[in-house]
Amino acid sequence: MTVSPRTSLGRLVPALLVSQVGFYVALLTPVQLLLTLRLSDLAGDDATSAFGIVTGAGALVALVFNPIAGRISDRTLWRFGRRRTWILTGSLAGAAALVALGAATSVWQVVLLWAFVQALFNFQYAATNALVADQVPAERRGGVSGLVGLTIAVGPLAGLALANGFEAGSARQWQAVAAVAAIAGVLAVVLLRDTRGVRGRGGENFLRTFWINPRHHPAFGWAWLVRFLITCAYASSSYNAFYLLQRFDVAEDEVGGMVLQLSLISVVLLAVTSVSAGYLSDAVRRQKPFIVFAGVVAAVALVLMAFAPSLAFVYVATGLLGIGTGAFFAIDLAMCVRVLPSTDDAGKDLAIINIANSLPQSVVPFVAPLLLAIGGYTALFGFLALLGVLGAVSVRRVPEIGQEHDESGRTAPITRHDLVSRTASDERTLA
C-alpha cells in the first residue's frame, strides 16, 4: 500500500476554515435569527417555548450523532478518505434539509427537520475536527486552533449578513444559508488530502467504545467538563434576538439588523483575541491561563447583560463576550487534542468532547424558561455567569502542556517514547 503524504498546512488550514465556516453558517444562523423569525410566524406568543423545544431536540440529536459520526469516520476505509467522505456527505445532505426547513408550515415540522439538520452536519463537524489531531503538528496546534476559533464568529456573521439580504422570515434566507454550507463542504474536500481509517479490532464492542473512563483518563474528563461549563456561558447568544425583542422592545423588522451589529462587534474582537491568543499560547507553551481568562470574562459580560439598563451596556457586554470567546476557542481545541486517549480514535474521542458543545444547547433551553419565569433575563444571565466561573476554576485540574495524567490521576511528563508512539500511530493511519 502506498503511503500518501498529509495535506500541507497551506491547504489544510484553508480547508479547516472553510468547512468550519460552512458548519457554523448552517447551524448558528438559524439559532441566532432564522428559527426565531420562523417560529414567531408559526407559534406566535408561544415562540419562546417552541424555540426551546426545537433547539433542545436538535441538541439532543447532535449529542447522539456526533460521537457516532466520529466513530464511523475513524473506521471508514474508502479510498476517498475517512474525513473527506463525511465532510462532503454531511454538508450536501444537511444543506438539502435546510432548504426543506425553510418551507416548513408547522412547529412539529421545524422540530423534525432541525433534528435532521443537526444529525447531518454533525457528520461534517466530527470529521473536520478530527483533522486537527490527524494532520496538524503538535507545535502548531495553538495557532491553528486560534484560526479555527475564528469560525464560530465568522460563520454566523456571514450567515446573518447573507440572511439580511433577503426578506425577513422568507424561504430564500434558508436557501441562501444552505447554498453557502454546501459550497463550503465541496471546497474543503477539494483542498484536502486524506487517509483511510483504521480497521476495528476483532470483537470490538461498538457501544462500549464510546465510554472513556474518567478515572483512567482524568485529563480528558476535566477538559470535557471545562468545555461544557464555559460553552454553557457562551450559549447566551442564542437568546439575543428574544432578549432584544422582550427587554428593550426592539421591533421585529429591526431585530435582525441589531443582532448583526452585535455580531460585528463580537467578531472583530474575537478575531484579534483568537489569533493572538493561539500564537501566544504556542510561544509560551501555556494554555490554562487563557481558559481561565475566557471563563472570567464571560462571567463579567453576562453580569452586565443581566443588569443592563440600556442598549449601550448590551454593546459593551457583547464586546467582552467576543474577547472571551476568542480566547477560549483559540486554546480549547488544542488543549482537548492534547489529552485525547488515542490518536487512532481521534474522530470518536473528539466527538465525545464535542458533546460538551452540544449538551449546552439542550441544557440552556431546558432551564431558560424556568429561570426566565423566576427572574427574567437577570436570572438567566446570572446563572450562566456562574457556570463561566466554575469552568475557569475547573481548568486547574487539566495538566499543562508537557504533562499528562497517568492512570492514578497524578501528572507525569510526556516522554520521548510517548511522542514516538503517537507519531507511529498517526503514520499507521495513512493510506
Where in this protein do the model-derived segments appear?
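Intracellular juxtamembrane helix-capping segments at the cytosolic ends
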Residues: 35, 123-136, 328-341
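Loop-to-transmembrane helix entry/capping segments in MFS-fold secondary transporters
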Residues: 46-49, 138-147, 256, 343-353
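Structural signature of the two symmetry-related core transmembrane helices
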Residues: 83-99, 289-304
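Juxtamembrane intracellular "pre-TM" segments in multi-pass secondary transporters
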Residues: 1-10, 194-225, 412-421, 425-430
